[in-house]
């Protein structure tokens, strides 16, 4: 995602007075959580607003070269969405945007997908983008049976490392279904995300 006027939270902030003058009472956001896609329905990290919508304060690394499908080579993307400075700055900026929306008497609705996540999700980490980070992240369930997120997903066989036998939404391996029946932790984690958004 490149910067473009109106396509990020700064664009929304810049147009709030205009929206208020139009009589807008509610602003509905598609998912804003970290995700590799434009639509963001394949959430990678429920704890943070995507820096591509929020703030990128640390930016370095390489883009994926044409024809290269190994996402571990997309170091610019990885740095943007795994560095705490970018993630925290984006959450803080979103809180500011919500505060400004509320100051104008408008409400906010945030869309999110809680049935499934994306294969990039730090709990699954099928794309191995959290593997080599600075020990800030636990190994994903795709990588290791011992992952603390193992029960967040339903696996059909014991084929670690890189177990591709998990349940996906409509069978899509890029959209791993979350295993609410097998994990109280995933329910708790989502409840925490809901509470964070409700506090804004």
Residue ranges and their predicted role:
Residues 1-17, 21-25, 32-195:
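Substrate-binding/active-site clefts of carbohydrate-active enzymes
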Residues 197-200:
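N-terminal low-complexity segments that are often proline-rich with Ser/Thr-Pro
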């Amino acid at each position: 995602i490149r910067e473009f006027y109106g396509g990020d939270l700064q664009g929304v902030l810049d147009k709030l007075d205009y929206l208020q003058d139009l009589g807008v009472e509610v602003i509905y956001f598609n998912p804003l959580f970290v995700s590799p896609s434009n639509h963001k329905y394949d959430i990678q990290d429920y704890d943070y607003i995507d820096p591509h919508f929020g703030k990128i304060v640390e930016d370095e690394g390489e883009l994926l070269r044409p024809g290269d499908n190994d996402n571990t080579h997309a170091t610019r993307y990885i740095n943007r969405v795994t560095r705490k400075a970018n993630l925290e700055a984006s959450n803080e900026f979103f809180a500011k945007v919500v505060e400004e929306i509320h100051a104008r008497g408008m409400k906010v609705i945030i869309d999110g997908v809680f049935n499934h996540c994306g294969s990039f999700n730090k709990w699954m980490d099928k794309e191995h983008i959290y593997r080599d980070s600075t020990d800030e992240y636990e190994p994903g369930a795709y990588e290791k049976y011992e992952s603390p997120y193992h029960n967040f997903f339903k696996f059909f066989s014991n084929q670690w490392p890189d177990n591709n036998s998990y349940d996906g939404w409509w069978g899509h391996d890029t959209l791993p279904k979350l295993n609410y029946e097998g994990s109280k932790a995933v329910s708790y984690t989502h409840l925490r995300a809901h509470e964070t958004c409700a506090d804004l």
